[in-house]
Amino acid sequence: MYLLDTNILSELRRPKPHGAVLAWLEGVADTDLYLSAVTVGEIQAGIEITRRQDAAKAAEIEAWLDAVVETRHVLPMDGRVFREWARLMHGKPDTLIEDAMIAATARVHGLTVVTRNIRDFQSFGVPLLDPFKTE
């Protein structure tokens, strides 16, 4: 089972998503795909930045995100995940907080993180997959 990183979800929003990503997704059951609430928050933050420049575009992306949240398994940042996040962050002041939260979610739920940014997650001890390199 897989936890999609923010960059993978963003890729799917592109007019022409990368072929390798689409091919990989075709081989995975929807029931095996999960999102972290952190990813939803990161996308929403991008929407808010866009809203200041182009309200119509922001509304379009927000409607897409609403549909994603309604149709995908979104895993919360609960007590178990926050405790794992604290373990991952301990002694790593240069670690990106959001990446550590996504990794903690994956560790607690036994998921593989699907990301283009493998290097960002290597120190967290979670299984990783880069669908851009699966062609």
PLM feature spans:
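Acidic active-site catalytic centers that drive phospho-/nucleotidyl reactions
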Residues: 5, 42, 99, 117-120
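A generic structural signal for short hydrophobic patches within well-formed alpha-helices
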Residues: 9, 40-43, 82, 121
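Active-site neighborhoods of divalent-metal-dependent phosphate/nucleic-acid chemistry enzymes
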Residues: 45-48, 53, 59, 71-116
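Short secondary-structure boundary/capping segments
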Residues: 24-27, 65-66, 73, 103-105, ...
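Residues that scaffold the ATP/ADP-binding catalytic core of kinase and kinase-like folds
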Residues: 11-12, 24, 46, 84-85, ...
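Acidic, PIN/NYN-like endoribonuclease modules and their adjacent C-terminal/linker elements
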Residues: 1, 103, 108-135
